[in-house]
Amino acid sequence: VICLKYRTPAQPPSRRTAGGALENAMSTPHLPRVPLLEPAQMSPEQKRIHDVIASGPRGQVRGPLAVWLHRPAMAERAQALGQYCRYETSLPTRLSEWAILVMARHWRSEYEWWAHKPLALKAGVSAPMIDALRNGEPVPYSHPDEALVHEFLTVLHETRHTPDDLYRRVVHVLGEAGVIDLVSIAGYYTLIAMTLGVFDIQPPEGTPPELGGAA
């Protein structure tokens, strides 16, 4: 495990309310660092991309897509890649959702974890596996391919390298197409985690954090 030390963030500044009183930013509802656009605020191109996303399998525009909508050409291309990575790869949904949770855990991405934990459970990833991943404990895998996906992604992130033996094993189990898809999922959800982190996109108010205290 690679441990990094961060400076404690400064206390958020106080701000003046509409009535003139001072209040600390911590007492106000959480707001992301960029405004999330309402349809009435969108340009014609933004509205077009918004409607494309909302009419697809996601059914709505939220999270990183809401940030990317400020750059509609980016949003259009990213949502197409995301649709492939989430719905159209050669991997079973059980493995793709497991891989997404591994990425969320690596990045400590509360939003990504919140959004995909129920999807992983629905796809057949066991609750004990998810709990162990969250807590940094040995994972009681239900299937050997889950262990291999976890190992592959962990080694890739910790060493920035894939040894020949590991590559051969993952190709043997997932096939060459499956490995390409797995790397694509990892890359796409890294982009998502970075976007969520930089622009401070959080789960809905009242959602308890699950990853902040993980080792």
Annotate each PLM feature.
Residues 9-16:
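Compositionally biased, intrinsically disordered low-complexity segments enriched in Pro/Arg/Gln/His
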Residues 16, 22-215:
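Hydrophobic alpha-helical segments
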